[in-house]
UniProtKB/Swiss-Prot annotation:
Keywords from the named record: Flavoprotein, FMN, Monooxygenase, Oxidoreductase
Gene: ssuD2
Family per similarity comment: Belongs to the SsuD family.
Catalytic activity: an alkanesulfonate + FMNH2 + O2 = an aldehyde + FMN + sulfite + H2O + 2 H(+)
Name of the molecule in the record: Alkanesulfonate monooxygenase 2
GO BP annotation list: alkanesulfonate catabolic process
EC number in record: 1.14.14.5
Domain of life: Bacteria
Main EC class the enzyme belongs to: oxidoreductase
UniProt key word Signal: no
HAMAP family named in the record: Alkanesulf_monooxygen
Lineage of producing organism: Bacteria, Pseudomonadati, Pseudomonadota, Alphaproteobacteria, Hyphomicrobiales
NCBIfam families on file: alk_sulf_monoox, PRK00719.1
Pfam families: Bac_luciferase
Function: Catalyzes the desulfonation of aliphatic sulfonates.
């Protein structure tokens, strides 16, 4: 007998850089407007998603300000917000953390983003090489963790110096959890030392298993345990043909020139090991997009970061998710284009098979029973009249 899958958290995504029905085209695009973010956040809150990721970068609305607004408009939804070592001070970030966690009644999660694009980082005033950014992040998180845990912090390091640092107003949570993704040795060392949830982009299960085993071993050597999550897009439809047609439609406006430019940018302008691994899955070729059963790399032809999607029927996608769970994944951060409609598809088609959103499913059954009783009762009255 196989053991039952471990409990699964299934987060969604707020597209603070804009949204749309097609990649590589301005047709049917949605601008990054707070009203639209509100629609998505309130929908996924009702649908049973426990949380959302808010991205960060020069082309995104600020994740902290956006999350603050959305927290006042939602009930249970958690917000995974970017913590940016090097871009802000750890002491100021700790005060932000405490304030937003209190405002949201303990619904704040932190996504540590060290950055993988030196050009964009230079625009933010960060000029450190790859491994030094992780060394700086280690100092940043050491100070941040101490402050949000209520400690008085004195620290004298290479990148930061703090004397008698403290928070007078602490977070609602004992310490908001730290999420982090980094594929390099320096990134995994940081995760093993200081973070709670180690994230990976959606590579084939065998590659994910290797990465998780490495991070798990590093953490064990430090006497720590990590949880593991994966970042994926989703294209789920009632039939396999519908799902693959939707995938093809998503990139139907992408030109060869756009692919060439995007791949050159990923490989030449970025020093992210994770981004390189994403690009190597398909090599910029349209005929190499199915990189594993139901795992499609079409998104990564032109989109940086998470570049793969699970494509198929609810049964097929559930099977793939169970494979990731079997190697240690207990959290999914999902998305789909456009994000409002695809949130409903995932919740309605996939959640029942994953055993998620059970409260909402029971409400649907209650409504169905009510209509059924009403219909049959009316039929009996009509027959007897």
């Amino acid at each position: 007998m196989t053991s039952p899958p471990s409990p699964l958290d299934f987060f969604w995504f707020i597209p603070t850089h804009g949204d749309g029905s097609y990649l590589g085209s301005e047709e049917q695009q949605r601008p990054p407007e707070f009203g639209y973010f509100k629609q998505i956040a309130q929908a996924v809150d009702r649908l049973g998603f426990p949380g959302v990721l808010l991205p960060t970068g020069q082309n995104c609305e600020d994740s902290w300000i956006t999350a603050t607004g959305l927290a006042t408009l939602t009930e249970k939804l958690k917000f995974l917000v970017a913590l940016r070592p090097g871009v802000t001070l750890p002491t100021f970030a700790a005060r932000q953390t405490a304030a937003l966690d209190r405002l949201s009644n303990g619904r704040l999660l932190l996504n540590v983003v060290v950055g993988g694009n030196p050009t964009e980082l230079a625009g933010d005033g960060v000029f450190l090489p790859h491994d030094e950014r992780y060394a700086q992040a280690h100092e940043f998180l050491t100070i941040w963790r101490g402050l949000v845990s209520g400690e008085r912090v004195n620290f004298d390091g290479k990148y930061y110096r703090v004397e008698n640092g403290r928070l007078d107003l602490l977070p609602s949570q004992e310490r908001p959890p730290l999420y982090f993704g980094g594929s390099s040795d320096a990134g995994q060392d940081l995760a093993a030392d200081l973070v709670d949830m180690y994230l990976t982009w959606g590579e084939p299960p065998a590659l994910v298993a290797e990465k998780l085993a490495s991070a798990r071993k590093k953490a064990a050597l430090r006497g720590r345990k990590l949880r593991f999550g994966i970042r994926l897009h989703f294209i789920v439809r009632e039939t396999e043909d519908e799902a693959w047609r939707a995938a093809d439609r998503l990139i139907s406006h992408v030109t060869d020139a756009q692919i060439e430019n995007a791949q050159a940018r990923f490989l030449n302008q970025m020093d992210s090991v994770g981004q390189r691994r994403m690009a190597e899955l398909h090599g910029g070729r349209r005929d190499r997009l199915v990189v594993s059963p139901n795992l499609w790399a079409g998104v990564g032809l032109v989109r940086g970061g998470a570049g793969t999607a699970l494509v198929g029927t609810p049964e097929q996608v559930t099977e793939r998710i169970r494979e990731y769970q079997a190697i240690g994944i207990d959290t999914i951060i999902g998305s789909g284009y456009p994000h409002l409609e695809e949130a409903y598809r995932v919740a309605e088609l996939l959640f029942p098979r994953l055993g998620l959103g059970t409260r909402r499913q029971q409400a649907h059954r209650d409504i169905a029973n009510e209509f059924s009783v009403g219909f049959h009762g009316a039929a009996r009255l009509q027959a007897s009249s």
